[in-house]
């Protein structure tokens, strides 16, 4: 296939990826967006195969591995529960980074196969491209592995910090720049392998100081890194589809990270440099004696809901862990049969990845027009009769507005405390991932429901009926 014809099809593929992003921006058009993305990827892969023009034995191996990898990916995605989606995303990000590293290694060791020159005589611009792609890919891989381990519970979700951490990260960052310079000058293998090794280490050190509550931002940031790694390798391979795709993923991930940082009153550059969410708890709530709380049960909750005219549901990570989304949908359907207005309030960083709660509610077939973002619904809490908080801790904590010493101070929260009655479903009074005691627990209008989120919701349904 001619280069001009390939470029046209790659452009079509890029347009389909843009349409996919547009479709995925709304639940109503998400299926259509997913279809555009699949179609664009099929076109890109097919044209890449046809452009090679050499159907040798090695090419057949590539096809076999492609089908094997695609089948495994489809099987994993099909089998994985929705509650484990954050770690699945982190795992896939790691594979994107590792793929970029492998392509860079292949191009460096065998440049003739990529029309980049000969060993020791690689084009200068190609060296820069593969160096950046390999470095960002290595950081993405190791960072995503740490994120996966934290999300999976294999590694502690608490921030891991040590003295001089930021200085070490700075030193490693400078070392990477110096190594890229010397690699382009000397084309030495030792500099190339050192670059990859230090990049792996830096990716690890950037993520370990980040707390579990801040994982949604980490996931979107790693998504951005994987995109830029792919774009860098796209330049090396002179593959316009890979460049377009990488740029789309990289820019969209960076924009999403910035938006989420604003939603948490955090610094965007802290995310990039690491140490995000590692602030130790100095809140005045820490160390205080435990205050008395009002404790209720499913019967109390059902009574309050039956006598309400409007109810707002605030889902959080606790709902995901308990897999309570289907029971929650059933409870809401019961309330609506009694002419009670029900809506869902979603905080932008609720859960462990961007859109985590939206995905779970969509799985339970919750109507899209009942789901509202923070800015859309925050003013409605003051007029609501009952708020049902199901596992959403830090994003409902009033200390974000009242306690300047709190690690979450300044973070926009859902104004749950303004509601007439707050039903808070939680296993215990333990703080959330931010490590801050929630003032909402001790408010006069709060009734604590200590139980598994799914079991409590099911008990409420029984009492409603």
Kindly label every feature range from the protein language model.
Residues 16-29, 70-89, 144-159, 202-215, ...:
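C-terminal ends of transmembrane helices
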Residues 211, 226-269:
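Mobile "lid/hinge" segments at catalytic clefts and subdomain interfaces of large enzymes
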Residues 248-308:
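Membrane-interfacial segments at transmembrane helix termini in multi-pass membrane proteins
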Residues 289-465:
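Structured cytosolic domains appended to multi-pass membrane proteins
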